[in-house]
Amino acid sequence: MSAEPLIAGVDEVGRGALFGPVVAAVVVTVPSGFARLWELGVKDSKQLSPQKRQKLSRQIQRDFVCRIGYATVKEIDRLNIFHASLLAMSRAIGKLPLSPSLCWVDGKHIIKDLSIPQKAVIQGDQQSPVIAAASIVAKVWRDDLITRWHRRYPDYGLARHKGYGTAQHLEAIGNYGLTSQHRLSFSPCQPRLEHDCRTICPRVIEIS
C-alpha cells in the first residue's frame, strides 16, 4: 500500500446557471498521481472543448476515485447559491469510500463541518490538477443532466446553453414561463415570476 497521503480535489459547476442543480465532483489521488493528470491534459474545464471534456472525464473516472454530489433547485432557492454549492461539495466528499488526508477546495472558502483537513485554493481549477480533474467530471455530469432535461423542455434551448442566462434562454423564459427546474431566487427569473403571480395569484383586497 502506498505511503503517500491521499489528496482530494473538489470543485462545483453551475453556480451561475438559471436552471438545474449545482453539481460538485471530488477526485482523489496521491501526489505522484498529479503527473498522470497533467499527462492526460487536465486543465480548467472551461478551457476544454465538450469532446475533450467527455474523453477526459471517462479517463479520470477510470483511473482515479471520483464521486458526484449536487444540491437541488429547491435547496438553491432556500439556502442561496453559495451555501448550496458548499452542500454539493460536502455531499460529493461524503460519498467517498476512503478518507483523504487533505481536501483542496476550489475558491476562497472551506466546507463547514467537514471532518477532514481542508485548504481553500483560489482559482484552484487552474492551479491544481486534482481540482481541475474534479471540475471536468462535474461539468460533464451536469451537462449530460441538463441535456436530458432538454428533452422534457425542448423550447428553452437547454442543450445549447446548459441552463445559463443566454439571450435565447431569457427569451424562452419570457415566452414560455418558468419550469420546475428554474431557480426562482435568481434575478433574471424574477420578472417572469412576478408576472405569473400577477396573472395566476388572486389579489388580496383589504376592505376597511
Swiss-Prot record:
Recorded hits in Gene3D superfamilies, A to Z, give: Ribonuclease H-like superfamily/Ribonuclease H
SUPFAM superfamilies, sorted: Ribonuclease H-like (SSF53098)
GO molecular function terms listed in the Swiss-Prot or TrEMBL record: manganese ion binding; RNA binding; RNA-DNA hybrid ribonuclease activity
**Top-rank taxon:** Bacteria
Residues the entry annotates as binding a divalent metal cation: 11-12, 106
GO CC, sorted alphabetically, is:
cytoplasm; ribonuclease H2 complex
Which cofactors, by name? Mn(2+); Mg(2+)
Q: Which InterPro entries match?
A: RNase_HII (IPR022898), RNase_HII/HIII (IPR001352), RNase_HII/HIII_dom (IPR024567), RNaseH-like_sf (IPR012337), RNaseH_sf (IPR036397)
Q: What is its EC number?
A: 3.1.26.4
A Pfam family for this UniProt protein?
Answer: RNase_HII
State its role.
Answer: Endonuclease that specifically degrades the RNA of RNA-DNA hybrids.
Q: What is this protein's name?
A: Ribonuclease HII
- Organism per entry: Microcystis aeruginosa (strain NIES-843 / IAM M-2473)
From the UniProt record, report the name of the gene that encodes this protein.
rnhB
